[in-house]
Regions:
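Single-stranded nucleic acid-binding surfaces, predominantly the OB-fold ssDNA-binding core
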Residues: 1-110
């Protein structure tokens, strides 16, 4: 029996900038969000904090409704899936991993 692939992510972090809202040709709203997630790691005898940065895309009415509250420093929880975007420019290939949000929850402000 073959196993199914799973593509699911839950992440909590703080916005690194205010979210940007744009509209696709279809009229669908898209909020572009950038979040920083701190993690601790051991460096010798000490624990140090290291930030990881992630781009999030949130589509639809939910993006429109929450956008005014998505300001720099706000802590949010994101549930969604990962998507790899690939493109070519001037003969050079590029790729990036983006989180496609199914839900975004406000947790607090700075």
């Amino acid at each position: 029996m073959a196993t199914s692939d799973i593509n699911s992510v839950v992440i909590v972090g703080r916005l690194t900038r205010d979210a940007e809202l744009r509209y696709l040709n279809s009229g669908t709203a898209v909020a572009s969000i950038s979040i920083a997630v701190n993690r601790s790691k051991k460096d010798g005898d000490q624990w140090v904090s290291e930030a990881n940065f992630f781009d999030v895309s949130y589509f639809g009415k939910g993006a429109e409704g929450i956008k005014p509250y998505l300001t720099k420093g706000t802590q949010i929880a994101v549930q969604g899936s990962l998507r790899q975007d690939r493109w070519e420019k001037d003969g050079q290939k590029f790729s990036r991993v983006n989180i496609l949000a199914d839900s975004v929850e406000l947790l607090g402000s700075r």
